[in-house]
Design a protein with these regions (language model features):
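Juxtamembrane regions of bacterial inner-membrane/periplasmic proteins
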Residues: 1-255
């Protein structure tokens, strides 16, 4: 038995009072059989298709048979932590959902009157890209919630493998998919060679891969307004012990 509880209460005169509750509950729940799509397929090598405006543009395997695939332990620890702290710092500790992050993102979107922040966890992003079509409607959101819940609560794919898949399929620029292509495209390096500044820059692109050029001034250097983002991520890296406090304090948006 599965039950889904959802509550959204908005006072547009006081957006900070917005209430958002979303919870999937189970009682004596067991999976008898899966449908045509295996929800555990990310655990092994599988074929991934990237889409642009609903049209497939790239298809490639996520595993050792792909020359662009990079195992998690071959990716710079600084890059791994930079992306995680930017996208979903609690990824290894939650079960796929962060209601507070969704609430804050919704409040911000309503304040600026546009879709500016998604609030999706890494698991949610994976489910959207690997399992679902590109339709944006309530039925698809329910599908997404159910698949996320099943993968996380039934432990169909390990967190380490999910993060490995994520870093190998995420878009880092127009038709630039995965960390190996991104490292070569921007810095002519392997993923294991990325510096702190380069790693933070790549993390900053993920929310806007098609518009990465907006981060640069006319002279080719990063814009000054990137400094706050660099400082924030560097501080989190230092808190995680990935870099030193001295390096975090001296970080600059300079690549």
């Amino acid at each position: 038995e599965l039950a889904y509880h959802f509550l959204l209460d908005i006072d547009f005169a006081q957006l900070d009072s917005l209430k958002l509750e979303s919870e999937l509950k189970e009682k004596d729940f067991h999976i008898i059989s899966y449908g045509a799509t295996s929800l555990s397929k990310m655990s092994d090598e599988f074929i991934y298709t990237a889409y642009e405006n609903g049209v497939p543009v790239r298809t490639f395997p996520i595993g050792p048979s792909c020359k662009h695939f990079t195992p998690l332990d071959s990716i710079s620890p600084i890059l791994r932590m930079s992306v995680m702290q930017s996208e979903d710092g609690a990824f290894f500790y939650h079960r796929g959902f962060l209601p507070d992050a969704l609430r804050e993102a919704l409040i911000y979107d309503l304040q600026v009157k546009r879709f500016a922040r998604g609030g999706s966890t890494i698991t949610m992003q994976l489910v959207k890209n690997v399992f679902l079509n590109r339709n944006k409607n309530f039925a698809r959101k329910l599908e997404e919630a159910l698949i996320v819940w099943l993968i996380e609560n039934e432990r169909l794919t390990s967190k380490e493998r999910m993060y490995e898949v994520y870093l190998n399929i995420v878009e880092w620029g127009p038709l630039v998919y995965g960390i190996q292509e991104a490292s070569a495209y921007y810095f002519k390096k392997r993923p294991s060679q990325l510096t702190t500044e380069e790693s933070i820059f790549l993390a900053s692109i993920i929310p806007k891969p098609k518009h990465f050029r907006s981060s640069f001034a006319e002279g080719g250097q990063l814009k000054e307004n990137m400094e706050g983002y660099y400082k924030l991520i560097a501080k989190r890296l230092a808190q995680q012990g990935v870099i030193s406090e001295i390096e975090a304090d001296s970080i600059r948006p300079d690549i």
